[in-house]
Regions:
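Glycine-rich phosphate-binding "P-loop"
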Residues: 25, 176-195
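Short, solvent-exposed helix-loop connector elements
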Residues: 268, 364-374, 389-405, 425
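Basic, amphipathic alpha-helical segments enriched in Lys/Arg and hydrophobic/aromatic residues
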Residues: 393-451
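Active-site-proximal, Lys/Arg-enriched surface segment
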Residues: 83-169, 174
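Short, surface-exposed basic-aromatic patches at helix termini and helix-loop junctions that form
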Residues: 205, 223-234
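An anionic, glycine-rich sequence signature occurring as long contiguous blocks
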Residues: 31, 156-181, 185, 236-240, ...
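Short, conserved catalytic/metal-binding motifs centered on acidic residues
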Residues: 69, 109-123, 150, 211-220, ...
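Gly/serine-rich nucleotide phosphate-binding loop at the start of the catalytic core
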Residues: 2-84
């Protein structure tokens, strides 16, 4: 090992030295962090329960639902289940506090608002909004709920801000299912694009941003792009590989003097991309990944798009990204393959962004800036991963409308606390990561809640026994058969 590599190894390891100040008073920080959210609730019981539930979401529990959290923090199971599942408190004031805190810490003029759906697989048919639909979590059509999320991506970090439950159209028309799951009367069916626009209209002025981004589920709808342009928003939206475009920078066919002058033909973005010369791609380094720099190749071209019913649409920039499916050394081994086989060694993504700004002037965003916006989509996926792996985002056991929204709001708040503590800890330990902050905090909470006395152990066991016996009782009652009491055993 050369001296330079040895020095860098030493530097990296020194960045991992954890000062006691990183975790000192972290439990107190959580208590102080919760105060603004407690003030958003009206009852003392709600203020107490929000702190306990957040502590449970940040704990060591394998399944972070109301029952498991209640056992950890030593409160009655029904108390937390009612608080999350059916209590009539409004989650929106808590979201308002969250948005304010995220903007205060991360806000920047050219920040990025990112929209993305996330699915939650379910087995039954009684949870609000559940239906056989596309489940991105499993990569197929399956029984699931889908939430639409609004995130904020800055250069320093990212966070989820707001959300909407995607209520399918057949659910919106079913009065019996709506009543069973407590769906409010004023809630009607809205497309996911409409839900994104609703959140943008609600928070757009408060959240400083220069771009809006989303995947091809949103970008394929021309009306959604049109609505963003009408609001003066700059966007980078994914589109399917079948999207029809006309290359406005390609040579136009020669005019023969009769009829209308010919125009470049319509073709799919995939067919258009396959005609490109290999030299037109520009290589950029997006970020430094765990296994080295992550590079992509990009191209930008001014095109005309189509509206519904094959009507001619506006001019937009088509942006194509190319990333290898394997590392560079593996690609060199495929140099002898023909063009089609070499093309299969890459993953392509297609995006559209407006050519004109709010004042109608032609915009020329740089490839580096477009790459930054495209990368924001990956940041939102990372936010989902944080929520699901560190704060039990997908581990709820509720069926009602309010239960789903209560759990989601508290999950986003819990993750934001981890982000805040990670930023604080990185001042002393630069290599500190959010999962390690959650791990350290969970150990501290274990010490707080698990100093068990004989009396508390008896309460834990009693709750489990009562749960089991009540289940046995209701099963027997359904069959109109009186359950037998269990006999006390005499010690011989």
């Amino acid at each position: 090992m050369t001296p330079a590599w040895a020095q860098r190894q030493e530097d990296l390891l020194s960045d991992c030295v954890v000062s006691p100040d990183v975790f000192h008073h972290m439990v107190d920080h959580l208590r102080d962090f919760v105060v603004p959210y407690q003030h958003a609730l009206e009852t003392e019981a709600g203020q107490r329960n929000v702190h306990l539930y957040l502590a449970g979401l940040l704990s060591h529990l394998d399944r972070k639902n109301a029952e498991q959290i209640a056992a950890l923090v030593d409160v009655e199971r029904l108390v937390l289940q009612e608080f999350i599942g059916t209590a009539p408190w409004d989650h929106r004031p808590l979201v308002r506090v969250l948005v304010g805190e995220v903007v205060a810490r991360l806000g920047e003029p050219d920040g990025i608002i990112a929209f993305d759906p996330s699915s939650f697989p379910k087995r039954g048919t009684h949870s609000v909004g559940v239906k056989r639909q596309w489940c991105g979590h499993r990569g197929k059509v399956d029984n699931c709920q889908v939430g639409v999320y609004m995130g904020y991506v800055a250069r320093s970090d990212h966070a989820l801000l707001d959300f909407r439950l995607s209520l399918p159209e057949d659910w919106a028309r079913d009065a019996h299912r709506r009543q069973a799951c407590h769906v409010p009367e004023d809630v009607q069916y809205h497309t996911r694009q409409e839900q994104c626009l609703e959140m943008l209209d609600l928070w757009g002025e408060q959240v400083p941003h220069g771009w809006v981004t989303g995947d091809d589920e949103l970008g394929r709808h021309t009306q959604f792009r049109q609505q963003l342009r009408a609001r003066g928003e700059r966007y980078v939206l994914g589109v399917p590989c079948t999207t029809a475009i006309r290359d406005l920078e390609a040579p136009w066919p020669g005019y023969q003097g009769r009829g209308r002058p010919p125009k470049p033909p319509w073709q799919s973005v995939t067919a258009w991309r396959q005609t490109l010369d290999p030299d037109v791609w520009t290589r950029l380094t997006v970020r430094d990944g765990e296994k080295g720099p992550i590079e992509i190749a990009m191209i930008k071209r001014r095109v005309q798009t189509r509206l519904e019913r094959k009507r001619t649409g506006p001019q937009e920039w088509l942006v194509v990204t190319r990333r290898p499916l394997a590392d560079a050394s593996a690609l060199e081994e495929h140099a002898s393959l023909d063009a089609a086989e070499q093309d299969a060694q890459y993953r392509y993504r297609y995006y559209l962004t407006p050519t004109c700004g709010a004042e109608g002037k032609l915009e020329q965003p740089s490839l580096a800036e477009l790459a930054r916006v495209i990368k924001a989509g990956g940041c939102i996926e990372a936010s989902f991963q944080r929520g699901k792996s560190e704060a039990g985002m997908d581990e709820y056991q509720v069926r009602t409308w309010e239960g789903w929204h209560h759990h989601m709001a508290l999950t986003l708040i819990a993750v934001w606390f981890l982000v805040s503590e990670t930023h604080r800890g990185q001042q002393r330990t630069p290599a500190l990561t959010l999962p390690q902050v959650r791990y350290g905090l969970s150990m501290l909470l274990l010490e707080v809640f698990c100093t068990l006395s004989i009396a508390s152990i008896c309460r834990h066991v009693q709750r489990r026994l009562m749960r089991n016996e009540l289940a046995r009782f209701y099963h027997h009652r359904a069959r109109k058969c009186m359950p037998q009491r269990k006999l006390r055993r005499d010690i011989q």
